[in-house]
Amino acid sequence: MNIYEQLQAVEDRYEELGELLSDPDVVSDTKRFMDLSKEEASTRDTVTAYREYKKVLQNITDAEEMIKDASGDADLEEMAKQELKDAKAEKEEYEEKLKILLLPKDPNDDKNIILEIRGAAGGDEAQLFAGDLLQMYQKYAESQGWRFEVMEASYNGVGGIKEVVAMVSGQSVYSKLKYESGAHRVQRVPVTESQGRVHTSTATVLVMPEIEEVEYDIDPKDLRVDIYHASGAGGQNVNKVATAVRIVHLPTNIKVEMQEERTQQKNRDKAMKIIRARVADHFAQIAQDEQDAERKSTIGTGDRSERIRTYNFPQNRVTDHRIGLTLQKLDTILAGKLDEVVDALVLYDQTQKLEELNK
């Protein structure tokens, strides 16, 4: 099947989806309606571009006909030639765009994510920066219309974050935030620095797709579940009922502790969401490490300790080291305006994949 046949098949399916989504039987089946809605949304950009491309092809045909029919009318012929030139340039642009839109999609792109942020090298300052990153992602999620839920958090005594685990839910969350995994470095003068010297600290970010139970089954025999009394806030319930849950995946020794909720069942459900994502991610990383050539052709899928981005406060500068992107917009980026960074990373990744296909 050539590219044009692929595009026509996508458009045909899109039109079929439109009819299905108007069918009362489908509308009454919530799960099917949601699945078909997601499928329609995932192909909308491709179909829109393909329809515009067909208009451009028609413009080329019309311009060529106009040149033939000019009958010595120099002005008309000149105008038609310019229209033909413009249309051919548009055709090339759309062909490149459509090739990218037809690239195989990451099966996780439409999923919600588990987001983990930790203060790393730099003590209190690293943990304060981890708090800044948490706020940045919260504000970005709000701008995208996503739901942001902090599931577990450990704070230090100066307003920083030792570790935070959050669930981010909404449309195409993973597709936009999957490139955030790695080490984020900050260069700034800490509030505790009396000499005005710039310090360098690091926080780490891990983004994992949410894995449903039906997608990844963990053998209950591989889990150890401990129930204990929660500590900290929670009122009288803390002392009377053991509601905190610790789950250990024995083969990998991956642990999750959850005590934010007031009931044992809710803590257990949240802990299982996190451990399922972590275990699936653990084995996915092993599989990916065995595909070195493929990993090197993409971004954001290498060493989790790799420094991916630097935030330089004195110069109001953010640099993404993977793609050489530098923006003098640190203040707006930390305020949650991440679109320019995310769009650049997505475009780079798509371009790299396209080059791989063309080899």
Swiss-Prot record:
Keyword Acyltransferase applies: no
Record SMART domains: PCRF
GO molecular function: translation release factor activity, codon specific
Modified residues (N5-methylglutamine): Q236
Location of the protein in the cell: Cytoplasm
NCBIfam families named in the record: prfA, PRK00591.1
Protein name: Peptide chain release factor 1
Gene: prfA
